[in-house]
From Swiss-Prot:
GO terms for biological process: defense response to bacterium; defense response to fungus; killing of cells of another organism. This is Temporin-1SPb. Antibacterial peptide with activity against Gram-positive bacteria (MIC=6 uM against S.aureus). May also show activity against Gram-negative bacteria and fungi. Shows hemolytic activity on human erythrocytes (HC(50)=60 uM). The lineage of its organism: Eukaryota, Metazoa, Chordata, Craniata, Vertebrata. Expressed by the skin glands. The keyword Secreted applies. It comes from the Eukaryota. It is found in: Secreted. It comes from Lithobates septentrionalis. Keywords: Amidation, Amphibian defense peptide, Antibiotic, Antimicrobial, Cytolysis, Fungicide, Hemolysis, Secreted. The keyword Secreted applies. One of its GO terms (cellular component) is extracellular region. The modification Leucine amide is found at residue 13.
């Protein structure tokens, strides 16, 4: 779950 959030944050940033 956390990995999905981090991946999304990376894409946004």
């Amino acid at each position: 779950f956390l990995s999905a959030i981090t991946s999304l944050l990376g894409k946004l940033l």
